Amino acid sequence: MNLDLAYRSFVLGVAGHPQVERLIKHRAKGLVRRYVAGETLEEALKAAEALEREGVHAILDLLGEMVRTEEEARAFQRGLLELVWALAGKPWPKYISLKLTQLGLDLSEDLALALLREVLREAEPRGVFVRLDMEDSPRVEATLRLYRALREEGFSQVGIVLQSYLYRTEKDLLDLLPYRPNLRLVKGAYREPKEVAFPDKRLIDAEYLHLGKLALKEGLYVAFATHDPRIIAELKRYTEAMGIPRSRFEFQFLYGVRPEEQRRLAREGYTVRAYVPYGRDWYPYLTRRIAERPENLLLVLRSLVSG
């Protein structure tokens, strides 16, 4: 295992301890504000409006993972519906992202499908695009099944995510081609065993570019979710060399990460979106951000010292 993946594994392991969670929640509020738009829908909409003024579109994401009861799943669905209704009147592109575990995937695929179907029935006529996030490897197959089911039911304003660090992803991409998916490509942020995921960052990066170029060659619309300057530069070079119009792809960033680069790409004429998370259940999201970059851990330590 290389140092990058060893660091990520260490951080995700430590962050799972209840004492660490309590400490960060109590003393690292400055870091939370950097990466999370707020705990309320109103705060998230204000953050989205600020991004729009800079030429960057927003992806709204109500945080929350792995509900334990059907009642919790339905409560989370109500939060999603409130988000859809709030976006309906906005003049800018409307886009939300969600995880199927938030809608009860671990309880029942039928429950998650039914709740998501109701969200899409409200979202599509209001011009709200819905992205299904991909979670850890045990949930990939179920997520893909539900995506295919929704497309076969006629829903078109729904997209999927694939992760370049999983060995299976190229086959998943090829299997999805008949559905002409709107694809978000990510490297992957979950702690995965070497049996299912590439153990080396260089291999993950190479696979990311391979999958991205393959998707473009197949005519898919691709959202490249990456902060890696080398990958962004190569994708810009490749699309220009191949004559692929900028209307066929976009770049996506996390809220608070490389904001200057977001604005620069937007000024260059690329479509740029920032993933804007909000809600009270922000801790799992924040720990994955800390695990992605060692400098984020330094910010946590400073926050813990300064309070």
UniProtKB/Swiss-Prot annotation:
Q: Which cofactor does it need?
A: FAD
* GO BP: proline catabolic process; proline catabolic process to glutamate
What does UniProt note on temperature dependence for this protein? Highly thermostable. Exhibits over 85% or 60% of activity after a 1 hour or 3 hours incubation at 90 degrees Celsius, respectively. The half-life is estimated to be 257 minutes.
Which residues are marked as site: Critical for catalytic activity?
Y275
Pathway(s) where this gene product acts = Amino-acid degradation; L-proline degradation into L-glutamate; L-glutamate from L-proline: step 1/2
Q: What class of enzyme is it?
A: oxidoreductase
Q: What is its EC number?
A: 1.5.5.2
**Cofactor annotation comment:** Binds 1 FAD per subunit.
Q: Which GO terms describe its molecular function?
A: FAD binding; proline dehydrogenase activity; protein homodimerization activity
The record lists its disulfide bonds as none
Quick one: which residues bind FAD?
A: M134, Q163, K187, G188, A189, K201, T226, H227
Its catalytic activity? L-proline + a quinone = (S)-1-pyrroline-5-carboxylate + a quinol + H(+)
Q: Which NCBIfam families match?
A: ProDh_Thermus
What does the subunit comment say? Homodimer.
What family, per the record?
Answer: Belongs to the proline dehydrogenase family.
Summarizing the function annotation, the protein's role is: Converts proline to delta-1-pyrroline-5-carboxylate. Has significant activity against O(2) producing superoxide during proline oxidation catalytic cycle.
Protein name (record): Proline dehydrogenase
Species of origin: Thermus thermophilus (strain ATCC BAA-163 / DSM 7039 / HB27)
